[in-house]
Amino acid sequence: KETNAKPPA
């Protein structure tokens, strides 16, 4: 599971 599965702000 990816911990940072969201684009950088």
Curated annotation (Swiss-Prot):
It comes from the Eukaryota. The keyword Lyase does not apply. It is found in: Secreted. The keyword S-adenosyl-L-methionine does not apply. Expressed by the venom gland. GO terms for biological process: killing of cells of another organism. One of its GO terms (cellular component) is extracellular region. Keywords: Cytolysis, Secreted. Coiled coil: none annotated. Signal peptide: none annotated. The primary structure of this cryptide Pep-7 is identical to that of cryptide TyPep-8 from Tityus serrulatus (AC P84190). May act to induce hypotension. Presents weak hemolytic activity at physiological concentrations (micromolar range), and weak lactate dehydrogenase (LDH) release from mast cells. Does not induce mast cell degranulation, and antimicrobial effects. In vivo, injection into mice induces increase in nociceptive sensibility and causes very reduced or no edema formation. It also causes no alteration in rearing (standing on hind limbs), and reduces locomotion, suggesting an increase in anxiety. This is Cryptide Pep-7. It comes from Tityus obscurus.
